[in-house]
Regions:
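Conserved, structured C-terminal
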Residues: 1-224
Length: 224
C-alpha cells in the first residue's frame, strides 16, 4: 500500500497480483461502504490530476525511455501509443518532458550518475520552461462543439471529460501553444472540470509566458 495522493487529496494505491485485483477491489469497497466510499469512473483519475496540477506520465506527457526498443519489448511488448494533436506526430520531443518542464526539480537526486545527468543539471541551473494550467475561453469551447450542428467549417470536437479519451496504452497528445503567433509551448491533458465548470489543460510554456493571467492560444485540432 502506497500513500500517493497526486491530486492533493489523501489517497492510496494498493498493489499486488493482477489475478487478485477484482477480489481486493470488492473487499475494499465493502469495507468502506459505511464510511461513504464511492466508485469513480476512470476518467476521474485524469480530471483529478489536472485539477490538482499534477502532470501524468503516459497521458500529459510521453516517456523517452520507450524510444529504446529493447527496453520497450522487454517491459511492455504489446504497448499501444496514440499520437494526436496539432503538433506534427513525428515530433516526439514535443511530447517528452524534463524534470524542470514539469516542476519536478525537487525529486531529482544528483548523488549518483545516470544517463543525461549533465543535461538535467544544466537545465535545472537555467530553466527555460515550466508547467502551468490553462483555463480555456468558454466561448471558444462552445464554438468548437457548436460547429457540429452548424453549416460551414467543422472543428475537432472535445471528448468529455477527458480529451483525448484514454484507451489501452499511452497517449502522446500535443497541441501548439501560441502567443501573438509565436510558439511558446505545448498543451496536453485537456479535461472538462465539473467542479470549476471550465475546460482546463496542462501546458509546458516558456517562462516569459508563464505568468498568472497571461493570455495564450492553443492551436486545436490534429496536425495537417
Amino acid at each position: 500500500i502506497a500513500r500517493v495522493g497526486m491530486s492533493g487529496n489523501l489517497a492510496y494505491e494498493v498493489r499486488g497480483a493482477g489475478a487478485d485485483a477484482e477480489a481486493v477491489y470488492d473487499a475494499i469497497y465493502r469495507a468502506g461502504a459505511g464510511l461513504g466510499i464511492e466508485r469513480l469512473g476512470w476518467g476521474t483519475y485524469f480530471v483529478n490530476h489536472v485539477e490538482g496540477g499534477f502532470p501524468q506520465a503516459t497521458w500529459t506527457f510521453f516517456s523517452a525511455a520507450l524510444d529504446d526498443q529493447s527496453f520497450r519489448q522487454r517491459m511492455i511488448p504489446d504497448l499501444h501509443v496514440s499520437v494526436s494533436g496539432s503538433v506534427d506526430p513525428a515530433a516526439m520531443r514535443a511530447r517528452y518532458r524534463t524534470p524542470s518542464e514539469v516542476g519536478w526539480q525537487s525529486v531529482v537526486r544528483l548523488d549518483h550518475d545516470f544517463i543525461g545527468r549533465q543535461a538535467v543539471e544544466a537545465e535545472m541551473a537555467n530553466p527555460r520552461r515550466t508547467i502551468v494550467t490553462l483555463r480555456w475561453n468558454a466561448d471558444d469551447v462552445l464554438d468548437v462543439m457548436a460547429s457540429l450542428f452548424r453549416p460551414g467549417r467543422e472543428y475537432k470536437p472535445f471528448d468529455f471529460p477527458v480529451t483525448p479519451s484514454w484507451q489501452h496504452g499511452f497517449n502522446a497528445h500535443a497541441d501548439h501553444v501560441l502567443q501573438q503567433g509565436s510558439h511558446v509551448g505545448i498543451s496536453s491533458g485537456t479535461i472538462y472540470s465539473y467542479h470549476y465548470r471550465e475546460m482546463l489543460s496542462m501546458a509546458t510554456v516558456d517562462l516569459e509566458a508563464a505568468g498568472i493571467g497571461t493570455q495564450v492560444e492553443v492551436l486545436w485540432g490534429d496536425h495537417g
